[in-house]
Every structure is written in structure tokens, then in C-alpha cells.
Amino acid sequence: METFDPTELPELLKLYYRRLFPYAQYYRWLNYGGGDGVIKNYFQHREFSFTLKDDIYIRYQSFNNQSDLEKEMQKMNPYKIDIGAVYSHRPNQHNTVKLGAFQAQEKELVFDIDMTDYDDVRRCCSSADICSKCWTLMTMAIRIIDRALKEDFGFKHRLWVYSGRRGVHCWVCDESVRKLSSAVRSGIVEYLSLVKGGQDVKKKVHLSERIHPFIRRSINIIKNYFEKYALVDQDILENKESWDKILALVPETVHDELQQNFQKSHSSLQRWEHLKKAASKCQKTSNVPTDPHAGLASAFRITSKMTNVDPGWSGRLCSSTVFHGWISMLAKESIIY
């Protein structure tokens, strides 16, 4: 594979914005077709911000139409584009209106799922590195969050895109969602962020305790991927150091027995079978359904993790078709599925 030369990026940007950037689709999306229910001057009141060469940051950009947007982007050749809210006035005229009159009125609800937040449940990569093994985490997260947004909240218009570097974004674009208050947005985020944990978790996971319906439905999705991902690709029960982290979370009544069985086993899959048998034993004792998938997924935050979710209207998130200049790569986002 040919090595990328960062000094070529400015010329590549010019080529990209002149020949490849999907201006028509971009404008149609952010103008929502200009149909019924879309306020007058909707696109003109949308804020854009550009990051240029040498990290020069320009806010409060706005455009009359697709043609103006196209001309300015080909003139500026931004390294990064952020999309903001739709305001009461044109953002490029925000200094000309009365103090306090310039207010955000609409904004999509956007979730940013970052692979680095899963470093405690992947062993193949870390930081911004991604491979086919750990990308399974993104697949699980997408299916979990998308199911909840669709079935639990009834949101219809959801755009999943690759962030261009180390994760995915979900843009929820329903008209009703774009007008949600900060309090309601925070409530949605809280609902989807029930599980907290990681390597610092000390609380034992009681496999028989009642589980929130969102987590239960998430576990059902995880089951389709768990053994292949956790036991084969990540080999989470490979050695004593690894399995001790798991056993620290199980009830004391089965801890010693599992420790002995784990030492006699030769693979993560074999140790997993012992863990499932222990869960079944707990179920018979307590007469309450148990599921080891639920315990491990909850403890290690496999269900869902989101970062940079702005519950307000004033924040901006990276555009769906951009160059990430600092890593010198094309970040043409594409729909995941």
C-alpha cells in the first residue's frame, strides 16, 4: 500500500471538493427537501463551522443555497466541517441582531460512539486503532442503539455513518426530534446510558437481579455476537489474570468452584461453559432466571456507550462527508447498514 504524503493533502482537498463532494445530497438532507413543515429560510439559518489548515477555526458560517455552499467550500477547502443548529437568524449575521435574540431553534439529536471508549473490553487494539475483530463492538452498539431509537422511542429517520476515524455517528432527524428540549434530550441519553462500569468495577454482578428492559433487549442482541467476539476473537478467559477479573464479579457461592474448573480448562470456550453451568446452578437455588451474558455485558459495558452527546442545541458535530486533516485520510462517511 502506497504511503500517504501529508504535503499532498491541500491538493487532494481541492480535488475532493471539486469532483467528489455530494453537494446535492448534502443540501437536500440539511434542507429536508424544503417540503411541508420546514420553516422558511431553514437552510440559510443553519450554522456551519470550518477547520482550515493549521487548525484555523471559523464559526457562524451560513449559506443561501447549494450553490453558495459549493462555492465557499471550494474556496476554503476545509479540513473539517461541523454542522450546528438552525438558528432564529442567519449565523453569519449573528453580530447584527439584538443581544439575546440569536437563539438556536432546531437541531438533530446526534450520538457519537467512539471505539476508544471500549478499550476495556477489547484486547486486539487500543486508542484509535481498529480491526475487523473489534469492529464487532460497533456492530453491536449500532444494533442496540438503533433498536431502542426505533422501537422504544419510535424515531423513524436515523442516519448511521462512519465518523471517519474511530467510531460511528447516528443522526436522528425526525422533525419532532429536531425540536426537542434539552431536558428531553438528556432523558433519552440517560435511558440509553444505563450501564456504567469497566475495569474499575468492583460491585459483584448478581445474575439473578432484575434487569432493566432496555438492557434485557440489548443482551438478546449481544448473544448473537458474544461467544465469537469475547471468547474467540478477544479470548477474555485466556489466562488467570484475565479470568480473575471475571470471577471477581460473580457471586461468592460459585467463585471457588469456578476457579478450580477454570484452572482445569484449556480454552475460553471451555471456561465459558463452566460459567454457564454455574449460572444455571444459581437459578435452581434462587428459582430466579439467570443469564451470564447479562452479567458480563453489564459489568463490561458491552451494551452501549456514547460520547459527545450534546443534550443542548448549541453544539456542533463533524459533518457526514469530511477530510480528517490531522490523520491525513479521507473520511467519506458511508451508511453502515
Describe every region a protein language model picked out:
Residues 1-163, 175-182, 187-189, 194-299, ...:
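Signature for HUH/AEP ssDNA processing cores
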Residues 111, 170, 319:
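A residue-level signal for conserved active-site and pocket-lining positions in enzyme catalytic cores
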Residues 162-168, 315:
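Short, conserved alpha-helical segments within structured domains
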Residues 168-175:
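A short beta-strand motif that forms the metal-chelation/ATP-contact edge
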Residues 314-316, 330:
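Active-site lining segments that contact anionic ligands and/or coordinate catalytic metals
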Residues 316-317, 322:
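Active-site/pore-lining binding-face segments in mid-to-C-terminal subdomains
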Residues 332-337:
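Low-complexity, glycine/alanine/valine/leucine- and proline-rich hydrophobic stretches
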